[in-house]
A protein has these predicted regions:
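Short strand-turn-strand beta-turns centered on an Asx-Gly dipeptide
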Residues: 214-218
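Secretory/extracellular carbohydrate-interaction modules
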Residues: 77-176, 265
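Ligand-recognition surfaces built from glycine- and aromatic
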Residues: 43-64, 134-140, 150-154, 225-266
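N-terminal module-boundary/linker segments of secreted carbohydrate-active enzymes
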Residues: 34-84
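Secretory targeting and sorting signals
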Residues: 1-37
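Short, aromatic/His-centered strand-loop micro-motif at the edge of beta-sheets
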Residues: 178-201
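Short tryptophan-centered beta-strand motifs in secreted/extracellular beta-sheet-rich domains
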Residues: 139-141, 197-213
């Protein structure tokens, strides 16, 4: 067997020593990157502050209380509230992510879970309601639907609700985005080619016993609706549950990115 010369053996040991720091740097790099990402996310303000959300809202979550009903976060707690992944700031700090999984807690009048903001009085101390037959009531919502549940890929994003049911909303089914009218889910087709993550502006204007609904500034539908106790909602209202969508767990959800929402009453 050939013996290695001292010079060749020393040369190989030197190469190994030189390679070791480079290998160590390569192994540490992803950890440093992950730390930087975490630091960036931590630097984001609370969700409400990220989009300048007014105090005139409360949050309804798909998370159960001890009694099984959905959790509600009211003012002033909502100002600083963050509950990932159900209500949190996007990584670029520009929007709120609202998520509702199919196995989430639901309110008594529905079988579907929601992560939604519900309109309140200006200081958030009481629920707000108004008539469509008097005055002009407007909500502008800047949003993107970013995820759909499986099997039944339906999500509502932004709506007017009255004392008993939703009056009108934006509803995505697969790639088809609709404006609804009460129990008519396909009242008006806005687009048949909606791509998840596409940001759009929706506007609802309730006046004279009807609601005009706009998509990116263009009037798309007018819904007849004379109601006395209307209110606005913004966020993700997943139209699927464990009876019609699988798997029945938190990996199966609807999600909306909310960049801004404003409400005016005149």
């Amino acid at each position: 067997m050939e013996r290695q010369s001292p010079s060749r053996s020393s040369h190989r040991r030197a190469l190994r020593l030189l390679a070791a720091p480079a290998l160590a740097v390569g192994l540490l790099a992803p950890v440093q990157s992950a730390s930087a990402d975490s630091a960036g996310a931590a630097a984001c303000p609370a969700p409400a502050a990220a989009i300048g959300l007014s105090t005139g809202w409360k949050l309804q979550l798909p998370l159960p209380t001890s009694s099984g009903s959905p959790q509600e976060i009211k003012q002033p707690a909502l100002k600083t509230y963050n509950k990932a992944p159900w209500f949190t700031t996007t990584s670029d700090c520009k929007a709120i992510l609202l998520r509702a999984a199919v196995n989430g807690a639901t309110t008594s009048n529905t079988g579907y879970p929601r992560s939604e903001l519900r309109e309140m009085t200006a200081d958030g101390s009481a629920t707000k309601s108004w008539p469509s037959t008097s005055g002009t009531h407007t909500m502008i919502v800047d949003q993107a639907i970013t995820h759909l549940p499986k099997t039944k890929p339906h999500v509502m994003a932004g709506q007017i609700h009255d004392s008993s049911s939703d009056v009108t909303s934006f509803r995505l089914e697969g790639t088809s985005l609709y404006i609804t009218s009460y129990n008519t889910p396909h009242y008006k087709l806005v687009t048949s080619n909606y791509q998840l993550g596409t940001r759009f502006q929706g506007k609802f204007v309730a006046h004279d016993g009807k609601v005009d609904v706009y998509y990116n500034g263009a009037l798309k539908a007018t819904v007849d609706g004379a109601f006395g106790s209307g209110y606005y909602k913004a966020g993700a209202y997943t139209q699927a549950n464990c009876n019609n969508s699988s798997p029945c767990d938190t990996s199966n959800y609807g999600q909306v990115a909310l960049y801004g929402v404003t409400v005016t009453h005149k």
